[in-house]
Amino acid sequence: LSVDYYNWKIKNEVKTLSTDQLLLAEYQCHNGLPNNTSASCQNVTDWVTRDAGGNLTRVYTPKLNVASQNLEAVTVGAKYQQDLGRFGSLMFSGNYTNMLKREVVALPGAQKLDLLSDPYNMWYYDNFAKVRGDVSVGWAISKFTTTVYANYVGSTPNYLAYTGRSYDYVHASGAKAGKWGSYTTYNMSLNYQAQDDLTLSLMVNNVFNKLPEGQRYNYPGNESTPFNDGFYSVYGRQISAQVKYDF
């Protein structure tokens, strides 16, 4: 059994300045206001190019050391093996991760963003689930080993929470922002040690062919992927075979 606590504080993180950020900085520099980047007004002037009529012709978006992050997480891992004598052995394994804090400051002087409570920025910056986990049970006997895996993704913001920037957002159609429930998929594998240097394997991912179909009602019809493809796969069940020979 292992329990770990992590606390990462990252400063001067490299970030690409966006076109919007630079155009806003240009406006601020021209009007004697503090600009919203760590770049000088001379840099901003060099990076934003306009023609004689003042029309925008080019914006150079450089990478600068501007962002900072604060992340806290706890992880728990466990492994156990039980000898069954002539019936082989059972292997158990499990991992759990809980994000306790996830804060981002995108630019110097900018507001600190709490990604755990802000569905828009949670999706925009990292696209993560607060809680994730996996468990596996394996059985080894003679030359055979079979394993069943379960992969767990905790609740995540739905699309309306992201676009409405709040879990309380209600669309004009009456559709409500909120969270998707937890999502679990199962994988299986079977290995046969034919020889000391030859292993045959059969693997099935997403055994029950689970798909994020329930999410599509929350998306507009013009979205190419009506689900959060950062977490969920549209491929469904996948079966593969492998022959491994060690030289």
Regions found by a protein language model. Name each.
Residues 1, 6-8, 193:
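Structural signature of Gram-negative outer-membrane beta-barrels, strongest in the C-terminal barrel
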Residues 60-65, 117-124, 165-168, 172-177, ...:
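Extracellular loop and loop/strand-boundary signature of outer-membrane beta-barrel proteins
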Residues 130-134, 185-187, 228, 238:
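Transmembrane beta-barrel architecture of outer membranes
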Residues 176-178, 191-192:
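Hydrophobic alpha-helical bundle architecture
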